[in-house]
Amino acid sequence: MYPASPSAGPALHPVPHRARLPRPRCLAEPPRSPAPGPGSTARPPPPAPGPRPRVAVKMTFRKAYSIKDKLQAIERVKGGERQASVCRDFGVPGGTLRGWLKDEPKLRWFLDQLGGEVGTQRKKMRLANEEEIDRAVYSWFLTLRQHGVPLSGPVIQAQAEAFARQIYGPECTFKASHGWFWRWQKRHGISSQRIYGEAEPPVAGPAPVKEEPAQPSSAGLLLDGTPATLPHSEGGYGDEQIYNANVTGLYWRLLPEQNATPGTGDSREPGECSRRWCSDRVTVLLAANLTGSHKLKPLVIGQLPDPPSLRHHNQDKFPASYRYSPDAWLSRPLLRGWFFEEFVPGVKRYLRRSCLQQKAVLLVAHPPCPSWTTSMPAVEESEGTPRQCQPELLGSPEELQTPDGAVRVLFLSRGNSRAHIPAPLEHGVVAAFKHLYKRELLRLAVSCASGSPLDFMRSFMLKDMLYLAGLSWDLVQAGSIERCWLLGLRAAFEPGQQPAHQVEEAAEHSRMLSDLTHLAALAYKRLAPEEVAEWLHLDDDGGLPEGCGEEVAPAAPPSPASLPSSIGAGEEEEEEATEQGGVLVPTAGEAVWGLETALRWLESQDPREVGPLRLVQLRSLITMARRLGGIGPSAAASDDGV
C-alpha cells in the first residue's frame, strides 16, 4: 500500500525559530481556598502578584505668613511663652519659628525702610529696585495729598522720571512704566478712586491743623494715600497712642548741705541759692504714653555746648539725651528737633513692635517762660514788666507734625479759666521722678563718704547725671503714670471732684521723704528734716529760677564746720600705713596715673553695665589722691566736673 500523496498547493517550509510566534499562555484561575471548617480560622488571601496600587497622598499647601504675624510670634516668645505653644498656635514647625527669631533684625529693618501699616501686611521683604526714586516720589505724594491736591497716574509717572533725572543725571534711562506704577501702588498701599465734580483751589500757606475733606473735582483718577494711618481729623487714638510731654527744672548735683548758706541762718534771700547754683541747673523733658508702657528717653538741656565728660562717647548708648541751650531752656528749635529726631522714630518703632496703627498724638503743656532777666531774644519790653508767656515760644501744631499727619502735637490750654486742662504728668509723675533722682544722688554721696562734698561734686559729672536720670525715669511705675493721666483728664469733665488716690499719694510721698531724710542723716549729722524738705522742693517751680541769666560768681566751697564729721578722719592713718618696712610705696603721681588709667578703661565700657556708682567712686579716689599728694587738678578736672 502506498502512502497518500500530499495535496496540491505550495510547499510548506518550516518557520525559523526566531520568527515563531510565542505560544499563548492559558490564564489559570487562582486556587480557591477551602471553605473554613467549624474549627478553623479564616486567613486573608495572599496579595496578588504584580506592582502594588499607588495611594493618593493629599499635599499640604504652603502658607505664607505676613510680617505682622511673624512679629507677633516673636513678641510672644520674647515675652516668656514656650516656643512649642507658639508653634502650635501658628501651625508652623519649630525650625520655622527659630528662623523668624533669627531674622528679627531684618524684619525690623524692612519696616523701617517701608514704614506704615502696609509694611506689616507684606509677606515678602522686597524693596524697589530704585529706592531713592521710590522714597522721593512717596514723600512728594504725601505732601501734595496733605494739601488736598488730586493726583493721577500719568502725573506721578512723569514726576518719577523727573526725580530720576535729578538723582542719576540727565543720562538716566529710567522709565516709569505702568508696571512700575502698579508695583509702587501695591508697595505703599495706595488705592485709586474716581471722583467727579469741581475742586476748590488749595489754600495758600501752611497746611491747616484740621484737614477738611477734598471736594469733588473734575473727572479724573484720585489716589488716596492714607491706608496706613487714618486722617488726624478722624481721631480714634488708643490709650497707647496718646502721649504727654512735660518739662521741669532740676539741680543735678546740688546736695542738701549746699542748699543753705553757712553762717547766715534764716537771713538768706529766697533766690540766693538759685543764683549761686544756677550753672548746675538743667531742664528735663519727660514723655510717656497713657498706659505707661512706652517711656521715651529723658531729654536733658544744659548750658554747656560741649561737656568734656560727653566727648568721644556715643550718646545713643546713654539712657538720656543731652542738648545745649544758652539758658538751659526748651526752646522752639530744640522741641522741633526732639520731635522729629527722637519722638517720631521712637513712637513708630513702638507702634510697629506692638502691631498698632501708625498714628499718635502728643499733648504738650505750654511750659512757663523764663524770667525776664534771662538773656533771651525777645520783642521790645519795658524794664519793669516781666515777660509774658507766649504760645509761639515752642511753635505751632501745624509745624510739629509729620508730612502725612499721622503723628502730631496738640498744646493744652493755659490760664486760670475753666477751660484750662492741666498736663497729666504734672499730677505726681514729675515729682516722683525728681524724688527718685535725688534719692539715688544721695546714695552716691553716701557711698563716696571718704571725701568731702566738694570732692563728690567734682567727681559727679554730667555723664553720670544722664545715667542717673535714665535710671530714675525707669523706676517710675507704669501704674503711677496711668493713674496720673486719669487725675489730669478728670479736670476737663469733673472740675469739683477730689482725686480718689490722694491718700495713697500722700503715703508714698511720706515714705520717699523718710528715705531721703535717713540718707541725708547718714552723710550729714547736723542736717534737720526741714532742710531736707527744703532741698527736696527747691526746684519745684518748673521753670528757670530768677537771676539765672545774670553772671554769678562761682560758689565758695563749704566751710570745714559744715562738713560731715567722718570726712578727713583717716588721713593720719594713711600716713602711718605708708611706713611699712620692705614694701615699695608708690608715689602720689604713680597712684594718680594708675587710677586715671583705670578710669579711662571703665569709661570705655557700656554705661548701663558699669553704672555711675563705680565711676563716681573712682573719680573721688583720684581727687583725694591729688589732694593728699599735693598735685594740682588735671586738665580734664579743670572743667568743674562736667
From Swiss-Prot:
InterPro entries: CenT-Element_Derived (IPR050863), DDE_SF_endonuclease_dom (IPR004875), Homeodomain-like_sf (IPR009057), HTH_CenpB_DNA-bd_dom (IPR006600), HTH_Psq (IPR007889), WH-like_DNA-bd_sf (IPR036388). Residues 83-103, 154-187 bind DNA. Residues 198-208 have a biased composition (Low complexity). SUPFAM superfamilies: Homeodomain-like. Coiled coil: none annotated. Residues 121-194 form the HTH CENPB-type domain. Keywords: DNA-binding, Nucleus. GO terms for molecular function: DNA binding. PANTHER family: TIGGER TRANSPOSABLE ELEMENT-DERIVED PROTEIN 5, TRANSPOSON. This is Tigger transposable element derived 5. It comes from Rattus norvegicus.
